[in-house]
Each structure stands twice: as C-alpha cells, then as structure tokens.
C-alpha cells in the first residue's frame, strides 16, 4: 500500500479519514474472495458497513488518482493510445439510478441493467491497458421525443471531454469498436484534437478519390467510383507477421462519416476457400496501415479490464442504488482490477492474441466472407 499512500499524498483535497478509508478499501478488495459488496467488505476489515456506504457517496478524483498511478507505471518512450468502450452490468430492482435497456454482448441481446462507459490508456508496446475513468450511462430523459434531447453519443463525448485533460501528453489516437463509428461521435473526437481508429461495416459506402486531370470548366471532379471490397487492385498491399493476414489500404471518402479516411482492409486467408476480412479506418490519412492494425488490435486491452473487474473486483456486485455510490463502486473496481487481478493471465492472453494477430480484429463473429 506504500505506492497508493504516496499517490494519495500527491493529491489535493484528500482528508485524512478519506485517505485512511481508501487505503483500507484497496487492501480489503485484494483479500476478499467472496462477493465484493458492503457487507462482505465490512466482514473482512475493521470498517463498519455504514462507513463503506457513507464514503462511497463522497466524491473522489479517480481520474487524477489513476493519472498519477500511470505516471509511475508507463515508460515515457512507449507508444500510448486511449480506448473507450461501454459494458453491461446486470442489476435488479426498480429504483437504481441509470436502470434501462442496454445491449449485453455476452447474451447478444438487449437486457435490463446498467451500462458503464470506460476510458483507458493502452500501452501499445507492452500490450497492457490501464483504466482511467468510468462513468455510468445516465437514464433516458423524460423530455418528450418532439424536443431535442441528449443521446448516448452525447454522453460518450461528454465523458471523453471531461477525461481528456488527464491523458498523457503523447496520446494522439483513440480506438473504438464499430459501434462508435458514427459521424457525430467521430466529428466530436476530432474536434477535441484526437484522431479516431475504429471499424466500419462490411458494406460501408466508400468512394475513391479522383486523382486525374480536371476539366478546364465546370465543377471539379471529386470521386472516381464506389469502392468494392471484392476488388482490391487499387489498394496498397502490406504484409504482416502472420502469413495468413494481409493489409490493403487506400485513402477514400466515407459517405456516412463525411470525411476522408485511410481505410485498411484486413484479409484473413487462413481458410483459402473462404477468405474473410474486416474494414478498419483512421481519420489520420497519414497513418500507415500497420499502425492502424496495431492500434485497433491493442483496443482489446479494455475488454480485459472489464473482464477482470467483473471476475475479481465485484464490478456487478454493488449494494447501492444512488448515482454517487455506483460511480465510486465502478471506478474502485476498475482500479482494484489493476492492483489485484492476476495480471499474468491478462498478459498471457494478450501475448497469445498478439502472436496470432487476430484477437479483436478477426474473430469468427465479426468476420465477413469475401464475395468471389
């Protein structure tokens, strides 16, 4: 706990009772092997259950705390990116803050529960992710649909806007899964000064940019036909370390995002009779195909944070219903995962996926067969 105490000493606005409680909480979460809730935390420590409930309602600067912790852990010369994703958390009852219908990836359907948006910093060279800030998706507004209301995309952007000041200075790229590849979100991220690396639909509407001579009169020609992923002859080919993975890249115009993108088609020929592909992109048209592939592959580290927080830190076991206590719980679980989860398992899984080159990019669920 010496490192945690040193970080708390560097933070302003932390009272001695709050400091002592946080040190106790971190240590207790490491030794608790049952459900991590207020009752079991009090059983494994000298702190009363009501004290846990009271402190969980007090504000704590988790983003600042995690920022100081990462400054001690991340080498300055390593390549770093940020990742953002949301995860479903089961929750029963009727009066819990944020209770709504959300997509549950494990069940592949919409279910009643909570959703938590997480922003993490990913060390691309070490292939490891660090949780920075977790925010719960707010409940739907009671405003009539005829009036303009904030959407979940607006919430994700606001979460990013609040967390961006805590990023390491070298972070310039953000990676997101295909659910975030919306014009409103991509435009908002770029407005903050970051580039987006994400995934497009297999049937994305893309247009080649016209590179030929222009006519002396009339409007200048911008496009040179629709992109067909069955014909990659106009793409630049790049080999990878995996013999069955090949990258094809080109700068095109995205009709849905209304901007130029560098698109990378990752073709998997492991089954020659049925090759598969996914379509990645970056808003930075100067970024090479290998880096786009490497950055998106590193995005999967945020999934390990969610997995370990749920398995080892009681992410879905909170005995609270109000917004402040839930916010404290989700952030404490993500931090507790970093300090107490069996990091060797995460590293082994990440290394195994990195060797195959297909952990988060070419899984069977999201591959698409090339039309011959």
Q: What are the language-model segments listed below?
A:
Residues 1-21, 29, 127-136, 145-149, ...:
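A short, flexible helix-boundary coil/loop motif
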Residues 6, 10-18, 28-94, 162, ...:
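Electropositive nucleic-acid engagement tracts
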Residues 25, 31, 275-300:
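Extended, non-catalytic structural segments that build the interaction scaffolds
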Residues 41, 79-92, 119, 173-180, ...:
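Short, conserved catalytic/metal-binding motifs centered on acidic residues
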Residues 88, 289-320:
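Short amphipathic alpha-helical "interface-anchor" segments enriched in bulky aromatics
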Residues 142-217:
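Domain-level cores of phosphate- or acyl-group-handling catalytic modules
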